[in-house]
């Protein structure tokens, strides 16, 4: 073991008083404390080279209660944020409005007129009678009748 690791050089402590250089182990200390350890403002003899804390590590928990409380609050806020984001994503993805039935089915007039023509002979009679009058009036009357019958059929389907 080198003599340099046993010699602690002089230093200024926190209260700006000068501490004289000393040799490890000091008088009254155990023989195992052979190394000079510590910082520039606090030096002491220790059993392992490179040790920087003269106290047990548990002192750090008692000194940082405020930091632990702050970290705990920050963790709770982060947890609340993550839960809120998850709930909002669930609501957005799984509670989309369902397709509402307006009660009206959209159909092409040609398709509905052929279906009505097959099922109802009165429409054909109306079309042939109206053709003798005026061509424009025939189309308007036939379209009105077809639309009324389509709406009636749709309302019957909705009622069931």
UniProtKB/Swiss-Prot annotation:
It is a single-pass membrane protein. Keywords: Membrane, Transmembrane, Transmembrane helix. It is found in: Membrane. InterPro entries: Shisa, Shisa_N. Coiled coil: none annotated. It comes from the Eukaryota. The keyword Signal does not apply. One of its GO terms (cellular component) is membrane. The keyword Membrane applies. Pfam families: Shisa_N. The chain crosses the membrane at residues 65-85. Belongs to the shisa family. This is Protein shisa-like-2B. It comes from Homo sapiens. The lineage of its organism: Eukaryota, Metazoa, Chordata, Craniata, Vertebrata.
